[in-house]
Amino acid sequence: MHDWDPALYQRFESEHTRPAVELLARVSHPAPRHIVDLGCGNGNSTQLLLERFPQSQLIGLDNSEAMLASARKRLPGVPFVQADIADWAPTVAPDLIFANASLQWVAGHAGLFARLMRCLAPGGVLAVQMPDNLDQPSHQLMRELASQSAWRDQLAHAADQRAALLSVEAYYDLLAPMACRVDIWHTAYRHVMPSVQAIVEWLESTGLKPFLDPLPAVLRDAYLQAYTQRIGEAYTKRADGHRLFAFPRLFIVAQRAP
């Protein structure tokens, strides 16, 4: 994929940040010394961590240089590092690994989650939030359009960028043998959106990227036009003219055994 667009992402920063706030609220570690914001993006979640734990040694990690530039501008006193979560290893065992809306882009969750738990210091916490929306109309329509003849050749592998999440039970079974506490919950947000275009713009900054980036301009515009029409049919107007955009998310907080 092409690099992320911080300006587009920031148009919906309050909606993107809300799950991070709710995830952090369930982290009970009293005083983590070393914290890693894994997949920190533009630093919105890093800022929450800094405000909650101002005495901690905090580092933000992401693979997008554009997002990291935005994060450094937001929090010039925090070190931000460009790295890939898939092969990242800490130099010091963290007391808290915070991964808000990042691990869904990394393959092989069985191995990934076990590795992250092993990276933690004894008693450390792994806090994860992941979109669980591949079966929502927003993402079903991406795949349906990608299978049509106009875009099939260019988008043959677009859907491979993200695999479906494991079941809640599978995540629990992965984490429980290494943890003294596992907290898992699922939330389906209903974001009140002013228009169809607002929904599409939100998705352009996230889930649509693997489907738009491979396309030349003419095909990209045609895909977006067809997608926007179908989104309007899937997310109909409510009584006040707004549209409810359903967005399920999975939350996990696991504390490594001391």
From Swiss-Prot:
GO molecular function: trans-aconitate 2-methyltransferase activity
An example Gene Ontology biological process: methylation
Function: Catalyzes the S-adenosylmethionine monomethyl esterification of trans-aconitate.
Name by which UniProt lists this protein: Trans-aconitate 2-methyltransferase
Intracellular or extracellular location(s): Cytoplasm
One Pfam family linked to the record: Methyltransf_25
Recorded catalytic activity of this chain's protein: trans-aconitate + S-adenosyl-L-methionine = (E)-3-(methoxycarbonyl)pent-2-enedioate + S-adenosyl-L-homocysteine
EC annotation from Swiss-Prot or TrEMBL: 2.1.1.144
Gene Ontology CC terms: cytoplasm
UniProt xrefs under NCBIfam families: PRK01683.1 (NF002463)
Keyword terms, alphabetized: Cytoplasm, Methyltransferase, S-adenosyl-L-methionine, Transferase
Main EC class the enzyme belongs to: transferase
Alphabetical list of InterPro entries matching this protein: Methyltransf_25, SAM-dependent_MTases_sf, Trans-aconitate_MeTrfase, Trans_acon_MeTrfase_C
Main location: cytoplasm
Stated family: Belongs to the methyltransferase superfamily. Tam family.
CDD domains: AdoMet_MTases (cd02440)
